A protein has these predicted regions:
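Bacterial N-terminal signal peptides
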Residues: 8-16
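Metallo-beta-lactamase
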Residues: 22-33, 66-68, 72-76, 129-258
Length: 310
């Protein structure tokens, strides 16, 4: 009897470890943000084993004959479950996936859409230049095994270097590059002029502090100016829950104040090692991830502006 119990206990342990566990359940629920546009809005956290990367916003646009996807999410399993949820709304293939930038929480789901539909991937050339199949990007190291399984790195098929205008199934899309480093080395935002919907990627976030670890404050300010020039009623950030016309306000205020305060600190001859105690950005301390990200943003932006002033 004791031997049987021991074997049962061992089996229970083995089959509940991540490698044997059932596929991670993302519990994805699409939110309709505009006519023919649905988004899966992520939690206001960094990627972790508990959220399995579902801290990113991904969107489906329903056209007359297919779905167009704006960012595919952090894993094959996330993408598969998102498509299953959207199939309850319309039984359509995904023929085009648009990737806004190179951070892998936004595009590792491409492997599902390439495998299932041979979807055309449109996005940054940076991905092709810096990632190859077999590389273990951040999501491979953070997500649990039952969430990241089957995920592969897929090359981008079309890499625009200027504004790309697309009409797909009667819906118009403008894919607009910033043209310089902003959130990352190569960022795009997507604008639907007839729908007045703008997808910002990580050029803007709300409800949480942005991570500008690979970015440029000057480029972010340029991107915000470019996005503001568009006539939008719906604004979808790369992370954040506010998809209204005010969805860019957080990012605009944060980066504008940061720039103004850095200029003042340089004028006052503040040293690099004391800048984070001088520029605190306390107006945003109630935003998610403030403690984790704000000081680094301030420090790196200060260094950037200080050198640009020389």
């Amino acid at each position: 009897m004791l031997k049987k119990l021991s074997l049962s206990f061992v089996a229970l342990i083995i089959f509940n470890t991540p490698i044997y566990a059932d596929t991670f359940d993302y519990k994805l629920k699409p939110k309709k943000v505009s006519e023919n546009v649905w988004c899966f809005l992520g939690v206001l956290e960094g990627p972790s084993k508990s959220n399995a990367g579902a801290m990113v916003n991904t969107c489906y646009v329903k056209t007359s004959d297919s779905f167009v996807l704006i960012d595919s999410g952090p894993s094959y399993q996330y993408a598969s479950q998102a498509y299953k949820a959207m199939s309850k709304i319309a039984k359509l293939p995904v023929n085009t996936v648009i990737t806004t930038h190179e951070h892998d929480d936004h595009w590792l789901g491409n492997s599902f859409y390439k495998e299932k539909f041979n979807a055309k991937i449109v996005g940054p050339k940076y991905i092709n230049d810096h990632y190859k199949d077999g590389d273990k990007t951040r999501m491979f190291n953070v997500l649990p095994a039952n969430a990241i399984k089957d995920t592969k790195i897929i090359k981008v098929d079309i890499t625009p270097n200027k504004t790309l205008n697309m009409t797909i199934g009667g819906e118009d899309f403008e894919m607009i590059p910033i043209g310089e480093k902003a959130h990352t080395d190569e960022d795009f935002f997507i604008y639907m002029p007839k729908r007045k919907v703008l997808f910002a990627g990580d050029l803007a976030m709300n409800g949480r502090i942005t991570s500008n670890r690979h970015g440029s404050l000057l480029g972010q300010l340029k991107a915000i100016k470019m996005m503001k020039s568009k006539d939008y009623e719906v604004f979808v950030p790369g992370h954040g829950l506010n998809t209204s016309k005010t969805g860019m306000d957080d990012a605009e205020q944060y980066f504008t104040l940061l720039y103004e305060r850095i200029l003042k600190a340089i004028e006052d001859e503040v040293d690099t090692d004391e800048v984070t105690s001088v520029i605190t950005m306390d107006e945003f301390k109630d935003r998610a991830m403030f403690k984790a990200l704000n000081a680094r943003n301030v420090s790196e932006a200060f260094t950037e502006i200080e050198f640009s002033e020389d």
